[in-house]
């Protein structure tokens, strides 16, 4: 019987984990090991993937992958759908004993074990932990930085650095969230390469106390790296609030490192954590325990195997700069990257293989499963002695009730459509549009007053034109769209922080698979509605190069907020009564073009299937007001910086080129300017689309630098909407809107694509987007001309 055959609400014991390669290793690292109990919670609305409960947390798995996992049919029982409460752990001592201070208790901070680094050395820390465990929140508390804090696995897609507050000789690096040190995704490779090669003086390992079994799996692998380390036990407020507790001192002694209970969100325990982290790094107090094998389990088969390999490869590991215990574990798992780094001789490889095969025969399961089982067995023993699990937490109970609607069979897709429609309606029709009108009034008033004052003072004509036509008309026209952009980012942030984005990935996996993508691809594309740059960076959470390339190619089709000024400007001038409807239609057109591109690409460039959908579903959490407000401010600040740097400079350059002729003298008519001569050369390319005017062409070129520059350039070149109406018809405006929707993303987005995929892909995407935009705009223009001909 396979896991695929297990009915909803039933629990069974896993007997065999099938599959091969990195995917199977990922299953094992996620806790899907022989002997573990697994419960089927539900199926996605379209019947695939399934949601499982294992080790006390929720995991998603496709049916095709579940079919590779065998279960014991005789072990099938009915589950009540709630997390089990640990009632057997009743400790004599107080389970919430306060963590000992510096110099108190245990082996930690004893001079005999200290090897201090030279004074003045910058203490570098790697902040490592599972995805969605509060890692970036802790980073913000430690450093005062304000990184994006989300509730979706993989928010940190790049490492970020910062000094610990009030400790200038420190540097903390926030690494991508990972589940293990196996090379399944690029994030895991980045994290382990950083720790092994950069050799930080200390590791801060953050663990979610409400999901401690899952999180400690990574902890055990970090301990094998033999780097001074402190464990930050996060979300202890939730743990205690739900009736659970942890024996901190006992946990500390069993792991061999300091353990500090904290609440990153409430800034509790952070000072103590900093003190311990700095101390273990300053005095290089390495973990006192790395060997978690039970010598009595299965006659110590795994224990003897690992120690034999450690003895054999010790010299190689030292030369390669890889901790020997870590190297031995990875060799048993079949990690090719570690094997290559060790540069073993052929006879040594054969000896290692013989040792591993002997262990498999004694243990009764394969090598990778044996290592995973060794770790989870120790974690189970550890938790039995140190953790009192609460019953179903308030957060989990709330999540179950919300999921009944948001991921329900008949309600999930309608709710997703309704939520996105509400976001767009509030952004373009209510909140954002209302605030935009207020800002436009303010900018117009300031422009008129400045113009009047400069006229009264008889300011030089060139300077007058520069300030009014170049700066106010250019930058001011873009600034008025700030409220819409911030509003859209606000709603996207709320969806991400709450945990809903992960559910969208779960719900959309099957339809996305039809076009060759995984459900995880939906998140970079949704982020792309805010900005293409983080959308492209978010693809690093995808483990397959094929999926990353395909998702990056589609992300620019998701209309970013920088294009909103273009839509708002043209719809207000040419289609004032249908403004909101047309803008929403443009968004859906972009999605449709992305789907069409995906379908074609799947049959040409990207053959094969999307990677398996294995993802943890976090509990819903109310977004923190501070986090949301900070994100809004960051986006507003970023927009203002762009407005007064890139857009400001673009406006000045455009003003200069359209004000002066080839002999650098002011021209009476801009058609005699330098700009007209340059842009006129490419204008014929756009003539079939209905907007062959050189000024339009100039604005599109400026849009390559920053999409907001399209509007500022048009404002500078045309001066007034009346002039624009004389040049463009509503049909031409519609064609231009479609072109702006689909043509090449800005230079920042192209740079991020180049960083992820290389120069050839970046250039290819620019040319591809421009070609698609030209064809789509041409089709719109042809259809419009045909309709007008029929009407006449």
Language-model features: where?
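Conserved G1/Walker A P-loop phosphate-binding module
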Residues: 97-180
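Hydrophobic core segments of alpha-helical transmembrane domains in multi-pass membrane transport
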Residues: 415-426, 488-493, 571-573, 586-600, ...
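Juxtamembrane inter-helical linkers in multi-pass membrane proteins
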Residues: 441, 445-449, 502-532, 607-631, ...
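Extended helical scaffolds that flank P-loop GTPase cores
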Residues: 283, 290-457, 663-675
